[in-house]
């Protein structure tokens, strides 16, 4: 039986306990405030990041892991007797992390590195990792795992509502005119991943109406399914996340609802107060 390791990056926001339970290795991305870089969830927690954000005039930037960090990780796994690594990462359209993993894989001898572009991030990415880890424990071969991840991708969706448009503007996803008009009209864009990129799905007036629409879109997919895993993801807005989670639980008894968070790297792009809803149609 092939000895397979699962590697991912920090934007899955697994946390140390869950990563250990799954038996996966996490390579961190970084956020950069001025000249200072911090590995997210290692040198800078999500709570500290959002607190720091309140006192900084300039929005931080983000940085993918260096190729060398992946090389070190893969070399260590090779020495530990692993024959194959399946390296699962956030969308290659929003970060070069996936490409860094592939580059590192081509530089390391004695182990095969198979990259997997999740086309998404955060809890949906974590679900890819969890599904892969489960199959590894069941003794599946690499191709079976990749084929299963492709099936998971077809049944995964996520929608986000951004609280403050200025983060999207400063990150280059909205121009100045869109920012002014959107702010004046209280427009709350519903965002989603399309071919791996974060793009507006619909533009709705007021946050309340935006979330009503998100629940409608969720219902269109979830109502006819028999088993659904949903996650409410928040950027330092636990009260809003809990409220939405309770609403979904009361409306859909067959949906397993959990709560997760946008950590520093993804929080930099979406901004504090943003909330997302992701789901995976199990059957």
Swiss-Prot record:
Question: Per its record, what are the GO molecular function terms?
Answer: lipid binding
Q: Which ranges does the record mark as transmembrane?
A: none
What PROSITE patterns does this protein's entry cite? Answer: DEGV (PS51482)
The DegV domain sits at 4-281
Keyword set for this entry?
A: Lipid-binding
Report residues binding hexadecanoate.
62, 95
Q: What does this protein do?
A: May bind long-chain fatty acids, such as palmitate, and may play a role in lipid transport or fatty acid metabolism.
Identification of the protein by name: DegV domain-containing protein BH3627
Native organism is Halalkalibacterium halodurans (strain ATCC BAA-125 / DSM 18197 / FERM 7344 / JCM 9153 / C-125) (Bacillus halodurans)
Q: Does the keyword Transcription regulation apply?
A: no
Keyword check for RNA-binding = no
